[in-house]
Swiss-Prot record:
GO terms for molecular function: calmodulin binding; DNA-binding transcription activator activity, RNA polymerase II-specific; RNA polymerase II cis-regulatory region sequence-specific DNA binding. GO terms for cellular component: cytoplasm; nuclear speck; nucleus. The lineage of its organism: Eukaryota, Metazoa, Chordata, Craniata, Vertebrata. It is found in: Nucleus speckle; Cytoplasm; Nucleus. Keywords: Activator, Calmodulin-binding, Cytoplasm, Differentiation, DNA-binding, Nucleus, Repressor, Sexual differentiation, Transcription, Transcription regulation. Transcriptional regulator that controls a genetic switch in male development. It is necessary and sufficient for initiating male sex determination by directing the development of supporting cell precursors (pre-Sertoli cells) as Sertoli rather than granulosa cells. Involved in different aspects of gene regulation including promoter activation or repression. Binds to the DNA consensus sequence 5'-[AT]AACAA[AT]-3'. SRY HMG box recognizes DNA by partial intercalation in the minor groove and promotes DNA bending. Also involved in pre-mRNA splicing. It comes from Grampus griseus (Risso's dolphin). Interacts with CALM, EP300, HDAC3, KPNB1, ZNF208 isoform KRAB-O, PARP1, SLC9A3R2 and WT1. The interaction with EP300 modulates its DNA-binding activity. The interaction with KPNB1 is sensitive to dissociation by Ran in the GTP-bound form. Interaction with PARP1 impaired its DNA-binding activity. Disulfide bonds: none annotated. This is Sex-determining region Y protein.
Amino acid sequence: MFRTVNGEDYSPAVQQRNILDFGKAHSLLWTDNGSANDRCETGGNCRESGQDRVKRPMNAFIVWSRDQRRKVALENPQMQNSEISKRLGYDWKMLTEAEKQPFFEEAQRLRAMHRDKYPGYKYRPRRKAKEATEIASRRLFSTVQPNAHRGDVVSLPIQGRLRQGHTFTNGKPVKPLTAHEHKQLTPATGASQQLDKPAPQ
């Protein structure tokens, strides 16, 4: 079930005409497939983190790149998605303003439809996992730090990109113990004089 395609089918003029015809023929915002996230745009049930989530309208690059991504993926099945994205970004930059104009117009039309369908919509980006971890670490430190007395060692469960094994004394990082220093720890106190030295900056 393959069809023979000539090079003219992928010319910018034919692609622009096909995209504009498709957009005018469909009253709903475009979606790639019927996945759960896409049902947000078409009025279906969509729950994420206990709240309804409405996707942003597509910009001109996304409108253009949808068909281009499929074409590149079919021509190069071994190519990674990240490589396809780089190639599409480069190809988009190489287009002239006249070639991009229909996609900007289509994106503007989609924004207007989105504004009419969701009048109170406000873009709220999802917090990245790394940010959430760092915020949680800061909150934990701020709750433990006031209870620490001068000279007390406060060990925190450190996550993310912070260095493992670091402890804090009075809010300042302390250099990690070497193997020799670790042997000098006394079982009764669990601390050594080395812990009072601040970490080198």
